[in-house]
């Protein structure tokens, strides 16, 4: 067992609930007190389990034997997924009143940027539950089942999805253009044109993402938020955000959000998940 540290406050109930709502069957298992999933690091495969210890402000990580040779990489992935490097005092200090209601919110990341890109594309114009079901179907068809844990499937690699038949993907329940967008994303990952870690210029990288088939501004921003764990992303034209700022245009909302730099990703989360929040007079 390995142990990672985090700074309180941390709303583990919210984080695990967020991940549970999006959990991909046969890839992830989420319960009230733990998170488990299949994981691939290079040629190594296995299952990782994360168990928060609220009293000690630690996260216990169990790795199956197949992942032990790449333990450091696995721990780094878990740290990014759960945003363990966040200093909530600094973030909440910058957010002011906005951060007061839910000071333990963290930015859910991911264990792999390509996987998050696939999930972001499959989440377009469908419910959270439907997106998880679609992703599970893709994983069942193109993922690799673990010999030691046959109940788990490793998320499909870029190589597998790049070679996919778009009609076979369409048959899973998605539009053909979305299937083609997945294949293009897989090829971009293989060619190195999809950054796997946060790029130096996030704004430019998001603009580049929008040149990919099937990726618009919202998807590019959401991918930056979760795939790269970019800390300063805001979505002024998001449906719920526009509801929270009645009577304001996206340009006005963007200007209002400048006050939360360089932590606008956290501001976005707080606005999404704080019922009844209203902006101050601009």
Curated annotation (Swiss-Prot):
Keywords annotated in UniProt: DNA damage, DNA repair, Hydrolase
Induction entry: Up-regulated by methylated Ada in response to the exposure to alkylating agents.
Pfam families: AlkA_N, HhH-GPD
Alphabetical list of SUPFAM superfamilies matching this protein: DNA-glycosylase, TATA-box binding protein-like
SS bonds (residue pairs): none
Enzyme class: hydrolase
Effect on the protein upon substituting residue 124 to A: Methylmethane sulfonate-resistant
Keyword DNA damage: yes
A molecular function GO annotation: alkylated DNA binding
Catalysed conversion reaction: Hydrolysis of alkylated DNA, releasing 3-methyladenine, 3-methylguanine, 7-methylguanine and 7-methyladenine
Catalytic site: 238 (proton acceptor)
Swiss-Prot/TrEMBL site (Determinant for substrate specificity and/or activity) positions: 218
GO (cellular component) term, any one: protein-DNA complex
Gene3D superfamilies: DNA-3-methyladenine glycosylase AlkA, N-terminal domain, Helix-hairpin-Helix base-excision DNA repair enzymes (C-terminal), Hypothetical protein, domain 2
Assembly and interaction partners: Monomer.
Similarity annotation: Belongs to the alkylbase DNA glycosidase AlkA family.
Functional summary from the UniProt entry: Hydrolysis of the deoxyribose N-glycosidic bond to excise 3-methyladenine, 3-methylguanine, 7-methylguanine, O2-methylthymine, and O2-methylcytosine from the damaged DNA polymer formed by alkylation lesions.
Protein name in the entry: DNA-3-methyladenine glycosylase 2
Organism, as annotated: Escherichia coli (strain K12)
Organism ancestry: Bacteria, Pseudomonadati, Pseudomonadota, Gammaproteobacteria, Enterobacterales
